[in-house]
Amino acid sequence: MSSDLKKINKVKKNSRRISNTQEPKLVERLIKISRVSKVTKGGKKLSFRAIVVVGDENGKVGVGVAKADDVVNAFKKAKTDGRKNLIELPITKALSIPHNVAGNFGACKVIMRPSIEGSGVIAGGAVRIVLEVAGVKNVIAKQLGSNNLLNNARASVCALQNLTTKAQVAKKRNLD
């Protein structure tokens, strides 16, 4: 009897381990690490700020920002922040976006247009990294305004949040 209970408990423990490891595999890409300083009464306190894009290359993406005393901890904290800010976006069969879209954040504006299969990601800077980590393979994007990497990454995430599918539009207009 007790050996049966031990086997059952062992199976339960193993099933918990397996379920924890079956989370979706997320890809992290570093946009920028910068050394920042805080001026205090005792002098300057140096720390590092990391900007990281996290995604599963299948329609989920998030941007994370964090500061820490060393680069490794800043990167880890930025990864966890990116996981908290994950959004989902619709991707077409051609691995593109469904329609034209624009997003703003601060003084940055990002315009995205769907592209034909095989054209690749035509974008620059942080917008390219966000689109690649999101899993979009064929798109044309242009960033206008400020060249700030963090704000451009956030503007591209805002643009991707504005994407809708035909089903969502039909439901919104009550065209069922």
From Swiss-Prot:
Gene3D superfamilies: 3.30.160.20, 3.30.230.10
A GO biological process held by the record: translation
Main location: plastid
GO CC annotation: chloroplast; small ribosomal subunit
Span of domain S5 DRBM: 26-89
Subcellular location: Plastid, Chloroplast
InterPro entries reported for this sequence: Ribosomal_Su5_D2-typ_SF, Ribosomal_uS5, Ribosomal_uS5_bac-type, Ribosomal_uS5_C, Ribosomal_uS5_N, Ribosomal_uS5_N_CS, Ribsml_uS5_D2-typ_fold_subgr
Keywords recorded for this protein, A-Z: Chloroplast, Plastid, Ribonucleoprotein, Ribosomal protein, RNA-binding, rRNA-binding
UniProt cross-references to Pfam families, sorted A to Z: Ribosomal_S5 (PF00333), Ribosomal_S5_C (PF03719)
HAMAP family the record matches: Ribosomal_uS5_B
Entry's family note: Belongs to the universal ribosomal protein uS5 family.
Function: With S4 and S12 plays an important role in translational accuracy.
Quaternary structure and partners: Part of the 30S ribosomal subunit. Contacts protein S4.
The protein's name in its UniProt record: Small ribosomal subunit protein uS5c
Biological classification of the source: Eukaryota, Sar, Stramenopiles, Ochrophyta, Bacillariophyta
